[in-house]
């Protein structure tokens, strides 16, 4: 995967990681080697990002969320927020995203609710097209195109 984010103004964290100088990354986030984080993105506590993932500009990642290997999350996506369901009262729930997914521009994905299984799951090699929404407690298998 190739990032569309220009490499100007990136801060090299080490030889394998490039994070833009304007990205905000919580100290409690866990980020593997080989992860690129673009301008003005916010990575919250409880977020885990595995190697090879590209986070483009203006992406918001909230936890608890685990993002697998070699995913590409495009600009203005919001991933891992709590459910807007009226029954949801802020209980600890999570989001799990597999490997090799493309999450295009403006996609929103909510964590689960305790009234269901407490987790939203996205499998491997999926394409979530621009402005699609994955609601709380959904489970998406592998090789799905979501419009």
What are these model-predicted stretches?
Residues 19-147:
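Structural signal for interior beta-strand "rungs" in well-ordered beta-sheet cores
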Residues 3, 7-8:
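Cationic, low-complexity basic patches in intrinsically disordered or flexible, solvent-exposed regions
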Residues 9-17:
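Short, Lys/Arg-enriched N-terminal segments with co-localized hydrophobic residues
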């Amino acid at each position: 995967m190739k990032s569309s984010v220009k490499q100007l103004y990136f801060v090299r964290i080490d030889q394998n990681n490039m994070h833009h100088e304007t990205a905000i990354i919580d100290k409690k986030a866990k980020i593997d080697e080989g992860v690129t984080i673009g301008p003005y993105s916010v990575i919250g506590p409880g977020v885990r990002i595995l190697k090879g993932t590209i986070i483009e500009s203006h992406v918001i990642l909230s936890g608890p969320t685990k993002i697998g290997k070699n995913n590409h999350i495009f600009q203005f996506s919001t991933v891992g927020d709590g459910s807007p369901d009226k029954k949801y009262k802020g209980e600890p729930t999570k989001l799990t995203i597999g490997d090799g997914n493309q999450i295009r521009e403006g996609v929103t994905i909510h964590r689960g609710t305790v009234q269901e299984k407490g987790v939203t799951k996205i499998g491997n090699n999926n394409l979530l097209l621009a402005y699609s929404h994955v609601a709380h407690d959904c489970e998406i298998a592998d090789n799905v195109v979501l419009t």
